[in-house]
């Protein structure tokens, strides 16, 4: 793999006149900035409909996009909205998800009404290639009808609507509107992705290994998951207690019925990965270790202290997937305390893994050897870490002195220790270096994007108010890119 570098920035974090980043002009501007400053990759977070706590990792579906990503500015350009529309929190550095949804929905319904009135084309042809969207639209419409409650608590006729015994005529308009939103979102994304390709920028997509229980994935594929007779999960995903959490993490996602997946030649996953392979150039699979061993928590257990590790058919899985999609570019999120078999699985398929400077950097002390290859992606931190500024500031003074001393010994003599750590990242022998935007800008922990194991605000809310500071900092990133041959 050629040495290269890029930036990690959630689409929601882009500047916007309408309260949340989207697929509009700011996304194109960001690609321009990446290309101008010699970057080759843009890593994003999942684009699916955000579920509980506005988390992109608890989506209502693994195929659909969240309608928040639809750009009102592009709808104006398409003359589906008037030239002048109201702005919404354009200079905010946080996304107010509930308010921005209400704000954008009104304009999206107006655009849809005009689309119908003018009898515009394109939707029917798109729908023929994307029949999955009907069940999702039906699911979301019934979810609204049931006050957004989980489908597990819907009336039986709604819970089993896919059996075909329900009169859906009262919901026809809302179903059609929801399908149209997906048509527009995918149209805007595909155009943006082509623009990135034309500028030689690879998009790194992100797929959570698990899906949320309150999702179309579970709703229409109940046989794929470990559920009881009422469709409730019998066991759920998470991780056991460790240094960071005394009771572990109880994520709540339903676990796969791996016997069923094996018997169906992993059809559910083939559909999912094949779909995403058309949207992104690389796919980062979150919690890769679960393809080797996954943690199985009884649903009744209040914490992750009660659970067991169970082996998964990782080799059979990837043999089948790669036979079907031989050119699939997978990045393995292989962080944490792993058994050697996880790394063997990763290396057997030559998947690049991840290295986090905050985890592995130990100043003048010996670094733990997790890799014996350049085939990895190095980050100062990810969306789940403190910002590098916040992390360094929280260290003991002695640790800070050790790191500063060691960076100087290695020849990283820049204006700030954050810039020295960025240089350390770029100088690594890892093939790819990716820097979170918060670290490009040397921001403190007020800009931290997510704290694992916590739910709700301020997670996922940070955004740029504009590109002014970004433009000032990117020349330094370009300098490091050239200096370290990326």
Give each language-model segment a name.
Residues 7-9, 22, 44:
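Active-site-adjacent substrate/metal-binding segments within catalytic domains
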Residues 178, 182-212:
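Conserved, well-ordered alpha-helix/loop/beta-strand core segments that scaffold catalytic motifs
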Residues 45, 202-204, 208, 282, ...:
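Outer-envelope exported proteins of Gram-negative bacteria
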Residues 10, 16, 54-186, 211-434, ...:
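Alpha-amylase-like alpha-glycosidases and glucanotransferases acting on alpha-linked glucans and related
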Residues 1-12, 28:
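N-terminal regions that are enriched for targeting/export leaders
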Residues 474-486:
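C-terminal accessory segments of extracellular proteins
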Residues 35, 189-199, 322, 346-347:
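Surface-exposed amphipathic alpha-helices with a cationic face
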Residues 25-50, 278-280:
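Catalytic domains of carbohydrate-active enzymes, especially glycoside hydrolases
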């Amino acid at each position: 793999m050629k040495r290269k570098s890029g930036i990690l920035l959630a689409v929601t974090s882009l500047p916007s006149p309408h309260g949340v980043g989207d697929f509009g002009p700011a996304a194109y501007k960001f690609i321009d900035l990446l290309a101008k400053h010699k970057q080759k990759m843009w890593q994003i977070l999942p684009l699916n409909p955000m579920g509980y706590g506005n988390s992109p990792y608890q989506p209502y579906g693994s195929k659909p996009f969240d309608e928040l990503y639809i750009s009102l500015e592009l709808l104006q350009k398409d003359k589906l909205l008037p030239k002048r529309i109201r702005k919404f929190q354009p200079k905010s550095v946080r996304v107010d998800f509930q308010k921005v949804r209400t704000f954008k929905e009104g304009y999206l319904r107006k655009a849809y009404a005009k689309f119908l009135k003018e009898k515009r084309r394109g939707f029917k042809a798109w729908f023929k290639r994307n029949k999955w969207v009907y069940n999702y639209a039906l699911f979301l419409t019934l979810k609204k009808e049931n006050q957004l409650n989980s489908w597990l608590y819907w009336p039986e006729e709604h819970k089993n609507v896919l059996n075909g015994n329900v009169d859906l005529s009262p919901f026809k308009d809302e179903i059609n509107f929801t399908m149209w939103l997906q048509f527009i979102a995918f149209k805007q994304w595909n155009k943006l992705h082509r623009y990135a390709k034309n500028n030689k920028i690879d998009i790194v997509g992100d797929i959570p290994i698990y899906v949320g229980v309150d999702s179309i994935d579970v709703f229409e594929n109940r046989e794929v998951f470990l559920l009881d007779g009422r469709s409730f999960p019998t066991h759920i995903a998470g991780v056991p207690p460790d240094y960071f959490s005394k009771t572990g993490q109880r994520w709540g996602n339903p676990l796969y019925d791996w016997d069923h997946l094996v018997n169906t030649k992993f059809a559910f996953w083939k559909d999912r990965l094949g779909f995403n392979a058309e949207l992104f150039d690389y796919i980062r699979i979150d919690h890769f270790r679960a393809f080797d061993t996954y943690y199985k928590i009884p649903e009744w257990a209040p914490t992750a202290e009660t659970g067991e590790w169970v082996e998964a058919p990782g080799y059979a899985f990837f043999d089948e997937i790669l036979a079907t999609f031989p050119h699939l570019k997978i990045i393995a999120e292989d962080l944490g305390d792993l058994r050697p078999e996880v790394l063997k699985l990763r290396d057997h398929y030559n998947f690049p893994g991840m290295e986090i400077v905050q985890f592995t950097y130990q100043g003048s002390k010996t670094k733990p050897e997790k890799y014996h290859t350049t085939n990895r992606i190095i980050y100062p931190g990810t969306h789940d870490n403190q910002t590098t500024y916040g992390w360094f500031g929280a260290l003991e003074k002695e640790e800070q002195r050790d790191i500063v001393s060691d960076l100087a010994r290695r020849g990283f003599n820049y204006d700030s220790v954050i810039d020295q750590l960025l240089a350390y990242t770029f100088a690594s022998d890892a093939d790819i270096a990716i820097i979170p935007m918060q670290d490009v800008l040397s921001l403190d922990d007020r800009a931290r994007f997510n704290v694992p194991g916590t739910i709700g605000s301020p997670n996922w809310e940070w955004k740029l108010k504009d590109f002014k500071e970004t433009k000032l900092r990117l020349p330094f990133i370009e300098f490091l890119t050239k200096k370290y041959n990326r």
